[in-house]
Amino acid sequence: MADEQRILDIIDGLEENFTEQEAYRIYIEFCFRFIPRIEHKIPEKLRAHLEAAEGYWHAGNVSPQALENARVLIWKYLDSHNLTYAPLRKSAAIRFMHQLFWDKANTDIWDHFDWCRELLPHLGYKNHTVRQELEYVLSEATREGFAA
């Protein structure tokens, strides 16, 4: 329960201390922390799109339009494989990856983290790991200044 409360406190802090886009950037970096661990659960056809997300968020050499195009292709994959409304356990890795393909927050930061926290248990991650990764990314964001 302490991990759960710490997660909620961190999210509250993001909302209070960062702009919406800065908090979203922290969220994106948080999501990137899990990709190497779940990549094997993502169909190979979709893994190639991770380069677009990496290029957009880290290298700055991918356009918002290219990011959107990849996002649409991922959604079409979900739809064509009847995973759009399937139980999360069947599509959690793809849906988690899909979070990286929005170039800006499309809802408030709580909604993003709620969705993420709904997906992570289906991928085998408990609150303890979520808290650790969230603390790490927040520390890095503050230290490196990418979100401050």
Indicate where each model-derived feature is located.
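Structured binding/interaction patches within domain cores
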Residues: 1-148
